[in-house]
Every structure is written in C-alpha cells, then in structure tokens.
C-alpha cells in the first residue's frame, strides 16, 4: 500500500502517539558517568575544556557521586586517576595506595548500590604519556601486558565491579583474564575498549587526565579512523580472549561501527561518547547556536539506536533534564 491509503504522519499527530510508537528510548540504566579522581585533599579543579566536570580528590568525589545518584538515578561510574607521581612503565598504578584503588575503597564504604568501572591503562601514569613501556621509541606490547594485568588485580582487590582495559595492546584481555582468575576474581567482568580509534576527539580528556603523549602519537596501537573491518577483527579477538563486553570509542563518528559490531556479535556493546563530542555541544550551546538539551537527547538516542547497550557519557549528570 502507498499514499493516500498509507499516511505515515498519522502516527506523528500528537506527543502521546509518538511516544507510544517510539523505537528507541534512553534511560538512566543505559548510562555510565566518568569521573577524574586526583591525589590530595579538598581539590575540585574545574576542567576548562569540559564545562561542569572537575578533577576531584576522593573527599570531593564522594559528594559528587551522591549528587549524581540522588538527582538522576544514574548509579554507574567510570574512574580515571591523576596520580601524584609517574614512572616510565606506569607501575605506580599497580600499587594498592594508588589513587584509583584508594577512591574505590572510599566509595565502597559509602555506597552499597554503586557500580564502579575501573579504566585500565598506563597513559595517566607514565612520564612519557604513552600507554605502556617504551622500547626503541614505541610501546612494547608484551612487557606492557604484565603491567596491565597487575593493575587489574589491584583494582579488583580494591572493589572494582568491572575492569575496562583501554590501552589497545594485543592480547591484553587474555592477560588480564588470566591474572584475575588466578587471583580469585573469575567473576569480575572485562569491558574491553575493543575498537578504540586514534581520534582527534580526545583532546579535552587528555587535558583533564594529564595524559597527552610527550612525543609522537598513539597511531601504532589505536585504530585508524578509516577502518571498520578491522574493528570487527579487534572485537572478535577480544571476545575469544574472554571479554564480557566490547566497546567502540568514540561514538558519534563511529555509529556505523557500533551498528556493525552489534549486528555481528551476540555480546553487550558499549559506546563512549567522548570528551571532544561533549565539549563541542557545550561550546555550541554557550554561543546560543543549538538547543543544548535537545541535542544531547538526540546524540544519546542516536548512539543507542545504532546498537549500543550501554553509553559512557559526560552528559549523564544532566540526564534528569532530558
């Protein structure tokens, strides 16, 4: 049948009908809010390039998380650490008194209904800003795996619910899974940053986390933005190594990749709505060029419509307004 028998506008005639037939709806259970936790006390440093976000010491992180839960009902967070000191290998992140495990233990003492995802990478903890040990001017894959595995065990011991390796080393999921299992954490899931692209959208995050590389870039381990078949190979490898969830990062420029991954694999798909995507919205809204709340809603809906089961987003704290 076609027009005039079929009139597609009939199901758009009022808000109640539109809501009834809506195919995609974002809700609080879909969202994870990232936080940046910094060593020290009474620190609440505004992140200039990410309005409304802060570097928070543990004592300031706790009320911020409480506010997130109370206002929005979002009870899932992702933690990134900003340490007091760094080293050549990122070994500082493996210590039990490192900033993220310290924050996790503090949060565990306050919140019983909070899901904590711990990012696993070395870039915040190395003096050179790369994601692993440098040998001959490049990140050495296999020696880096040992650090990532040790870091994962430390965070699991501290109480992390989910381990999320973001380094893009080959074999990291298998190394982490083996280390977790050997230390009694066989029920701790791995959320792998499987298709993490060498993107220009990470700029504000690197300012926030102090993780910009001191030389070169990350194109020898993060993915080429031109490739999508490669993303499927990365996802397949991570699943075979034991990943429980897989991630595509960034989200907006890679909706096609999210869709391909969801269509190809029967596994939960996470999408990271990254700092540059967030900051573009904030900048445009500050200049009066867009309706901020409408655009945020549209972005999150498009990510879920593409196939994401879970969305990591700095907009999570604004969810109550959407």
Region roles according to the model:
Residues 1-22:
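N-terminal amphipathic/basic leader segments beginning at the initiator methionine
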């Amino acid at each position: 049948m076609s027009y005039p028998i079929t009139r597609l506008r009939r199901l758009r005639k009022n808000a109640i009908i539109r809501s009834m037939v809506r195919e995609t709806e974002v809700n609080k259970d879909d969202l994870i809010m990232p936080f940046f936790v910094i060593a020290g006390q009474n620190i609440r440093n505004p992140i200039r390039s990410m309005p409304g976000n802060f570097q928070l010491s543990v004592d300031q992180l706790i009320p911020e998380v409480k506010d997130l839960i109370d206002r929005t009902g979002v009870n899932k967070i992702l933690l990134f650490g900003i340490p007091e000191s760094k080293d050549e290998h990122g070994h500082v992140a493996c210590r039990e008194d490192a900033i993220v495990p310290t924050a996790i233990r503090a949060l565990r003492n306050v919140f019983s209904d909070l899901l904590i995802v711990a990012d696993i990478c070395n870039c915040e903890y190395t003096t050179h800003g790369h994601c692993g040990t440098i040998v001959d001017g490049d990140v050495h894959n296999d020696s880096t795996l040992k650090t990532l595995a040790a870091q994962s065990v430390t965070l699991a011991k501290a109480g992390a619910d989910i381990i999320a390796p973001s380094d893009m080393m080959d074999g990291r999921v298998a190394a982490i899974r083996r280390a977790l299992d050997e230390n009694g954490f066989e029920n701790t899931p791995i959320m792998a940053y499987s298709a993490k692209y060498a993107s220009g959208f990470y700029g504000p995050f690197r300012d926030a986390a102090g993780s910009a590389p001191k030389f070169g870039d990350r194109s020898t381990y993060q993915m080429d933005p031109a490739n999508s078949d490669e993303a499927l190979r990365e996802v397949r490898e991570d699943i075979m190594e034991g990943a429980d969830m897989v991630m595509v990062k960034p989200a907006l420029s890679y909706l096609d990749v999210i869709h391909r991954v969801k269509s190809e694999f029967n596994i939960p798909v996470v999408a990271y709505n990254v700092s540059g995507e967030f900051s573009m919205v904030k900048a445009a809204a500050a200049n009066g060029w867009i309706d901020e709340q409408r655009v945020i809603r549209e972005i999150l809906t498009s990510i879920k419509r593409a196939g994401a089961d879970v969305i990591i987003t700095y907009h999570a704290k604004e969810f109550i307004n959407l």
